Amino acid sequence: MIKWFLIVFGLAFIALFAGTLYVRLASHDPAQWHVDPETVTEVNSDNQYRDSADVTGDRATVIARLSQVLTGEVVGGTWDSGFVTLVVRTPLYGYPDYVSVRVVEASAEMSRVTIFSRSRFGKIDFGANKKRVETILTALKASPDSAS
């Protein structure tokens, strides 16, 4: 009986370990994940969230601030272009979430920031993507360069 328990437990552990390795080592296809947050059509489901805000500051200033607030591995675009996609990993298991950002200068003093965050795996994210987007936008609005 104990022998079978150990075998089942060992197989379950191996499966969990293999799944964790797959999630952590899965490649990122920019063609699939680097999408324009302003024009993407599938948004605000249970595992993704999109929002935008006007932020005080010219485009270069807002991009510089955003690159400090949002950290992760760039998988598409560049910060300098104002259109970038990053993979951000969850703290416990390292699940990849993709965050696409576009910064457009609305006027000499204002920039429009649009963020689309989504999970690669799973059907629900328990609000993690919404929280991420709202936290980033709040930080940008509260920065010293932003008065609104």
Segments the model singles out, each with a brief description of its role:
Residues 2-9, 18-148:
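Ser/Thr-rich, low-complexity intrinsically disordered terminal regions
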